[in-house]
A protein has these predicted regions:
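Periplasmic/extracellular, small/polar-rich flexible segments of pilin-like filament-forming proteins
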Residues: 59-139
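Residue-level detector of intrinsically disordered/flexible regions characterized by low predicted structural confidence
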Residues: 4-5, 41, 127
Length: 139
């Protein structure tokens, strides 16, 4: 009696490759959108933290500051978010108000919708080029 070798046929292999290709085509854009939203959330959280620290500094010193170490950060000037996507900085500060910004640093498709976030001493939140990046979580 003859024994047959068992294995994967070329047709089965091709079907697996096609199914994986379809799954990748569907899943990858969704993954990219999720990653972009996570980076934006990280930038917004950093700006809100700076706003909180600025208010604490103001209560103690009766003025705002551009020096990040005065706010409790390890660096005096700009710093990057943990994902290295946004540069966070306090661009202006005086006795009346401050302005903190987060600017996207990479040259890819994610930068198009929410490249810049800002918050000031009055709590006004702005973004560019899209004006609703702070409130719209689907961007």
């Amino acid at each position: 009696m003859r024994k047959y070798m068992r294995g994967v046929t070329l047709m089965e292999l091709m079907i697996v490759v096609v199914v994986l290709g379809i799954l990748t085509t569907v899943a990858y854009p969704s993954y990219r959108q999720h990653a972009a939203r996570a980076k934006r959330t990280e930038a917004k959280a950093a700006l809100l933290q700076i706003a909180t620290m600025q208010e604490r500094f103001y209560l103690q010193n009766n003025a705002y500051t551009t020096n990040m170490t005065s706010l409790g950060f390890a660096v005096a000037g700009n710093f990057m978010t943990d994902s290295n996507s946004y540069v966070i900085s306090v661009t202006a500060a005086d006795a009346a108000t401050f302005n903190a910004t987060a600017v996207y640093q990479k040259a890819d498709a994610e930068a198009g919708k929410c490249a810049t976030f800002a918050i000031d001493g009055r709590g006004v939140k702005t973004s560019a080029p899209s004006v609703d990046c702070w409130t719209n979580t689907r961007l």
